Amino acid sequence: GILVVSAADGPMPQTREHILLSRNVGVPALVVFLNKVDMVDDEELLELVEMEVRDLLSEYDFPGDDVPVIAGSALKALEGDEKYEEKILELMQAVDDYIPTPERDSDKPFMMPVEDVFSITGRGTVATGRVERGQIKVGEEVEIIGLHDTSKTTVTGVEMFRKLLDYAEAGDNIGALLRGVAREDVQRGQVLAAPGSITPHTKFKAEVYVLSKDEGGRHTPFFSNYRPQFYFRTTDVTGVVQLPEGTEMVMPGDNVEMTVELIAPIAIED
């Protein structure tokens, strides 16, 4: 990922939140872009901001001393200033060199979270999204899972960047043409998956760490029957929390095992 920090303002509270979030969701590496350097005349101030960012990264177990830091100005680059255009190229080179290329999970059963749905006159309904794992070939059956009863359809076309393909694999952003499916029968938050490979659930157990106020989380405790939103791939669903017997409440900063009952079924895996 690219962490953007204003050279004029230095790390802000949301900078800490972004680093923490990156750590918690498993982002493997970060590259820093110090933006708006054209507004800073003092070289020592720039060095101070860079040191602050490196310290913050180290605080959350990123290798702060080793992370590439590129100083530039996005606005000046957009205005055609060659000096700052070079900095953007330098940034992208750092991304290529420092951030590991993700491995495509192509051998497992096909699964694609649905991001958007639209109709093509005369052709049918298209679901778009990024293939999370596996492969899909034209003519193969898939299940539409989550939010409603599971249904089955056939992928009659695969399109990427306005080109028709015979198949798609993990990492591809595609549109999948679905046979005999009405526009209202598929929606964001569902998944397309190889038949029998994943099932919808409304109830699950989870081990949870509750972010503290300093980490951008809660200010107050919560109790059983608390109803937060739970995020799954491309959607969020309300769930009712049940705390373990004998646990009256959970404070920010606590670890807890809880049972959650969702108000709609979602494709969930361990």
UniProtKB/Swiss-Prot annotation:
GO MF entry, a single one: translation elongation factor activity
EC number: 3.6.5.3
Protein keywords: Cytoplasm, Elongation factor, GTP-binding, Hydrolase, Nucleotide-binding, Protein biosynthesis
PROSITE patterns per UniProt: G_TR_2
Domain tr-type G: 1-103
CDD domains reported in the protein's UniProt record: EFTU_II, EFTU_III
Domain of life the protein comes from: Bacteria
Reaction(s) the record says it catalyses: GTP + H2O = GDP + phosphate + H(+)
Subcellular location as annotated: Cytoplasm
Positions annotated to bind GTP: N35, K36, V37, D38
GO cellular component: cytosol
Gene3D superfamilies, alphabetized: P-loop containing nucleotide triphosphate hydrolases (3.40.50.300), Translation factors (2.40.30.10)
NCBIfam families assigned to the protein according to its UniProt record, in alphabetical order: PRK00049.1, PRK12735.1, PRK12736.1
Its job: GTP hydrolase that promotes the GTP-dependent binding of aminoacyl-tRNA to the A-site of ribosomes during protein biosynthesis.
Quaternary organization: Monomer.
UniProt record similarity statement: Belongs to the TRAFAC class translation factor GTPase superfamily. Classic translation factor GTPase family. EF-Tu/EF-1A subfamily.
Protein name in UniProt: Elongation factor Tu
Gene, per the UniProt record: tuf
